[in-house]
């Protein structure tokens, strides 16, 4: 008998009920009792949905008010001093203060904890803050309360914990530099393990038989001391009187396989979607008493599982393992939308190819039933439907476009190279553009006012004509241009009033994308995103931005910059196809964007920015796999940017905090100008560019757009002087960290006035020095 179980379920609700309740609570429109009631309703509904889909062992503890890592920080008492409530007891407001830097009755104006990507997903977690003298204690009982809830409903359950090694790995040491630089956070393990033991003992006392302990870092390159720590930790935790399933996901175990197989636990979950090659090896290495859970259904994408293919593996495993076989999605379904059945307006053919969280649970259950009762009528019907879907999708003319494939096949090496090297190009560009030293610009977007959003909503709902919508957006463009001219910026942007999202705006105009109404997934806290779905070969039927940018250029004699989203970012922030490699999809996107770049150039646009915000996010978890990814990601950017003349200047923008390990690839992109987020690091990130001797122009962000604070001119001058120590002054641009979409106009204008003043001050100082 194969057990159908699940590692985790989306917590936001099919209608984003959690998001709405959280935001109502933060605004004071919903009290804590009301918020907790929404949480209970969602948990009960989600457990029932999984049960109805055929899941036998339900996850408990996958729900979180904001983030599962943050919930663990509260449970273990990892609450930074600035958030500790005076009365000593952690509350929901404590949790939200840690996440948002805001609380209604405590903690003052404390800065929120750092947030970063959860491995290589688009989910973000709150980074635990450890101190050298960190103590751990059981401080938050939400998990135990949820266990009682589920038991009261009569469910068979499996509580979910983040394992002690992964939890420590995900955190950061905070405090005095002289202490944190010499202290290894792994030394905290012995202090943390007793609290884990206490949690496990308490779960056992509640009658829990199995607990799932997530250790996703087993899919990473681990130092030897961390590998050794795994054995020590789980030797101690084996004393707890309940069964433990260690769950790994997002990649293969590789050199950690032997370690994972021999840990003193009762079961192991492996991801066979990301790493199918590990199956035969783990089967041979797993001790005969252990359960093996196979992740055969993709928990991170939206495509239906090929049930015949998955069943072939499951049947083989059943022959070897018998009742020790469990089946599950590859990872938590947190990364999947909730329920495909809500999509009442989705193209029926494309819809037949998809599966969201509820449907993925059904697929897992079908596989388990197919092991136990292969002739079951429902099983046979499900397998027949799966075969029909796979065949229809493989043959669909909507997916496979001969013209796109012919164009891909015709790509030559020269298509990914500019005509001349940067040193030649930059002289031609400077002669054409006639910009001053320290040229000023912005990253692209200006404030999205309520009026802009209402106009776009009315247009999409058919309440505003195309003509009236165009007129409204043109008025916003005229306003943005006038403001920039008045401030004195050198290179202007049109402000992107017509764009709701930097990916969706372009995806809506490309063939090969489809969009959902309810395909929301959690990004962090109450923020949800609705990624577009790439279902077929990608192409651009017509220009996407040219009319808007041309109109903006007509409003000014100054240089207007075209604004596009790059192919890698388009791919990373979409649900990608599974039937062709990601690099093929990136090339298709690159060709579509290349056409837009060339059309912008033909329209007289002299500077074109191609944003690659997600370039680094695509890096595989294992460093040995980086080179392949970086090669095709760089090639995709160059392919979209290399169709223009030397005189046309190509910019790119990246907004993340680590460049050292990818600086060669960033240089290989060969953008004429790269703008980057540096203000919060006080320009320290530029050290990577100096050490590498980065050859092209750079625009280090001189102020943080994530804050409404307006920095003064002297502060920005200081940052630019610091930047000039790393980058030759003739190659420095002056710009904010990122786009200004989320800011208001008053602070935007005030900050840009000071930024332009800072650039002029540096020009004057440089002129005086030359004189």
UniProtKB/Swiss-Prot annotation:
Pfam families in the record: Meth_synt_1 (PF08267), Meth_synt_2 (PF01717)
Gene Ontology MF: a single term: 5-methyltetrahydropteroyltriglutamate-homocysteine S-methyltransferase activity
E.C. number(s) listed in UniProt: 2.1.1.14
UniProt-annotated binding residues for 5-methyltetrahydropteroyltri-L-glutamate: 16-19, 117, 527-528, 573, 617
NCBIfam families recorded: met_syn_B12ind (TIGR01371), PRK05222.1 (NF003556)
Similarity field: Belongs to the vitamin-B12 independent methionine synthase family.
UniProt-listed PANTHER family: 5-METHYLTETRAHYDROPTEROYLTRIGLUTAMATE--HOMOCYSTEINE METHYLTRANSFERASE
Annotated function: Catalyzes the transfer of a methyl group from 5-methyltetrahydrofolate to homocysteine resulting in methionine formation.
Protein name: 5-methyltetrahydropteroyltriglutamate--homocysteine methyltransferase
Recorded name of the encoding gene: metE
């Amino acid at each position: 008998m194969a057990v159908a179980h699940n590692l985790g379920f989306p917590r936001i609700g099919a209608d984003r009920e959690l998001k709405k309740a959280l935001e109502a609570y933060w605004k004071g429109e919903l009290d804590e009792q009301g918020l907790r009631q929404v949480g209970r309703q969602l948990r009960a509904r989600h457990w029932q949905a999984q049960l109805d889909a055929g899941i036998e062992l339900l996850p408990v503890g996958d729900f979180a008010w904001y983030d599962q890592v943050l919930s663990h920080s509260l449970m273990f008492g990892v609450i930074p001093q600035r958030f500790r409530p005076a009365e000593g007891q952690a509350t929901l407001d404590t949790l939200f203060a840690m996440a948002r830097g805001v609380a209604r009755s405590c903690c003052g104006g404390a800065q929120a904890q750092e947030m970063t990507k959860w491995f290589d997903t688009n989910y973000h977690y709150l980074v635990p803050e450890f101190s050298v003298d960190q103590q751990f204690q059981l401080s938050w009982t939400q998990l135990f309360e949820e266990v009682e809830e589920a038991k009261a409903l009569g469910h068979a359950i499996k509580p979910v914990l983040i394992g002690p090694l992964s939890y420590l790995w995900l955190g950061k040491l905070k405090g005095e530099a002289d202490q944190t630089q010499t202290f290894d956070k792994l030394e905290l393990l012995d202090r943390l393990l007793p609290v884990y033991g206490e949690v496990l003992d308490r779960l056992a006392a509640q009658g829990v038989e199995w607990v799932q302990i997530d250790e996703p870092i087993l899919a990473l390159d681990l130092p030897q001391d961390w590998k050794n720590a795994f054995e020590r930790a789980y030797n101690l935790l084996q004393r707890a009187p309940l069964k433990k399933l260690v769950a790994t996901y997002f990649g293969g175990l590789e050199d950690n396989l032997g370690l994972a197989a021999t840990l003193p636990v009762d079961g192991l979950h492996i991801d066979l979607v990301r790493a199918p090659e590990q199956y035969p090896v783990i089967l041979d290495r797993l001790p005969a008493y252990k359960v093996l859970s196979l992740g055969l259904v993709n928990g991170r994408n939206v495509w239906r599982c090929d049930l015949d293919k998955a069943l072939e593996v499951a049947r083989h495993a059943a022959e070897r393992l018998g009742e020790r076989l469990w089946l599950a999605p590859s990872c938590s379904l947190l990364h999947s939308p909730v329920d495909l059945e809500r999509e009442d307006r989705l193209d029926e053919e494309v819809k037949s190819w998809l599966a969201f969280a509820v449907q993925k649970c059904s697929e897992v259950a079908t596989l388990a039933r197919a092991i136990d009762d292969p002739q079951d009528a429902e099983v046979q019907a499900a397998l027949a439907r799966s075969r029909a879907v796979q065949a229809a999708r493989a043959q669909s003319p909507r997916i496979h476009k001969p013209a796109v494939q012919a164009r891909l096949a015709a790509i030559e090496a020269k298509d990914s190279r500019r005509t001349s090297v940067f040193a030649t190009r930059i002289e031609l560009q400077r002669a054409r553009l006639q910009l001053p030293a320290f040229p000023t610009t912005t990253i692209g977007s200006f404030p999205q006012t309520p009026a802009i959003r209402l106009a776009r909503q009315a247009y999409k709902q058919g309440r505003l004509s195309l003509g009236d919508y165009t007129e409204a957006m043109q008025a916003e463009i005229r306003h943005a241009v006038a403001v920039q001219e008045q401030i004195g910026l050198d290179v202007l942007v049109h402000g992107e009033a017509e764009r709701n999202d930097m990916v969706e705006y372009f995806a809506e105009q490309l063939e090969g994308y489809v969009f959902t109404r309810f395909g929301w997934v959690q990004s962090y806290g109450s923020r949800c995103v609705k990624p577009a779905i790439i279902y077929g070969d990608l192409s651009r039927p017509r220009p996407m931005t040219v009319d808007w940018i041309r109109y903006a250029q007509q409003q000014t004699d100054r240089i207007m910059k075209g604004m596009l989203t790059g192919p890698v970012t388009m791919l990373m922030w979409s649900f990608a196809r599974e039937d062709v490699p990601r690099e093929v999809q990136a090339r298709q996107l690159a060709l579509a964007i290349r056409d837009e770049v060339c059309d912008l150039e033909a329209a007289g646009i002299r500077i074109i920015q191609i944003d690659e915000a997600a370039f680094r996010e695509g890096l595989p978890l294992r460093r040995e796999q980086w080179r392949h990814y970086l090669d095709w990601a760089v090639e995709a950017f160059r392919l979209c940017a290399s169709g223009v003349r030397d005189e046309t200047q190509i910019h790119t923008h990246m907004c993340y905090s680590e460049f050292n390990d990818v600086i060669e690839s960033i240089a290989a992109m060969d953008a004429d100008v790269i703008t980057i987020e540096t203000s919060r690091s006080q320009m320290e990130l530029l050290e990577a560019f100096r050490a590498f001797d980065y050859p092209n122009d750079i625009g280090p962000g001189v102020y943080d757009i994530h804050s409404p604070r307006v920095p003064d001119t002297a502060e920005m001058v200081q940052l630019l002087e610091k930047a000039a120590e790393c980058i030759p002054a003739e190659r420095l641009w002056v710009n904010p960290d990122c786009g200004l979409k989320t800011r208001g106009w008053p602070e935007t204008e005030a900050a840009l006035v000071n930024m332009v003043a800072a650039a002029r001050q540096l020009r004057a100082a440089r002129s005086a020095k030359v004189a």
